[in-house]
């Protein structure tokens, strides 16, 4: 199943996300409720296959994301951030997943700007419950100084463990906004409108 989630502060994106998902995808969509309004909840219930309630867990904000991945009942799961624009059929992404690994696209803009290899957590695929997923959840609970779930995951990996725990997905499954600035001209199945400028771009499409 595909999995996404958000809280009330991001639910304005949901009609746009769901429309793109329904246009291109046939696989079930599971939603993790991080704290939606009643209106947001109604939109979700009408359009997804199952809803998971994560409103009462101790994790805050995007740190609920790894936990929602762990709790998703599907054997094969692909998390997609709500600021991702699905532009093509992506159902075949499930054929690329490997046991005991998180399947992710390299975050080339961050790799370029931060000096070591990063992977973007906007699209994360996995089979069953990989050990690294449990480690990611534990690290987010202990997190005090990292700014997001992607940074926490990067911190618990080194170049060697990255090879054994992360499977590289083709770039087309998660093309970052900054890649367009950097001259990317390859295929785009998922366009990831990151950051404030990305949100402004999404608003312009509503």
Task: Give the location of each predicted region.
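Short, solvent-exposed loop/turn segments at secondary-structure junctions
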Residues: 8-10, 36-37, 84-85, 108-111, ...
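Short, solvent-exposed loop/turn segments at the edges of secondary structure
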Residues: 118-119, 186
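Catalytic core and acceptor-binding pocket of nucleotide-sugar-dependent glycosyltransferases
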Residues: 126-205
């Amino acid at each position: 199943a595909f999995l996404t989630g958000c809280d009330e502060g991001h639910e304005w994106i949901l009609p746009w996300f769901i429309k793109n998902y329904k246009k291109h995808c046939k696989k079930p969509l599971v939603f993790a409720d991080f704290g939606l309004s009643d209106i947001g909840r109604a939109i979700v219930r009408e359009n997804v296959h199952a809803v998971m309630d994560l409103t009462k867990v101790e994790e805050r904000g995007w740190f609920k994301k790894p936990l929602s991945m762990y709790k998703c009942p599907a054997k094969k799961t692909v998390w997609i951030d709500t600021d991702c624009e699905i532009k093509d059929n992506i159902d075949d992404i499930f054929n690329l997943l490997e046991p005991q690994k998180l399947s992710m696209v390299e975050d080339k803009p961050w790799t370029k700007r931060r000096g070591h290899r990063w992977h973007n957590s906007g699209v994360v695929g996995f089979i069953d419950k990989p050990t690294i997923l449990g480690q990611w959840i534990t690290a987010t609970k202990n997190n005090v100084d990292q700014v997001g779930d992607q940074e926490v995951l990067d911190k618990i990996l080194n170049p060697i463990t990255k090879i054994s725990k992360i499977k590289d997905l083709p770039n087309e499954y998660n093309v970052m906004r900054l890649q367009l600035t950097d001259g990317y001209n390859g295929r785009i199945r998922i366009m990831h409108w990151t950051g404030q400028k990305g949100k402004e771009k999404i608003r312009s499409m509503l």
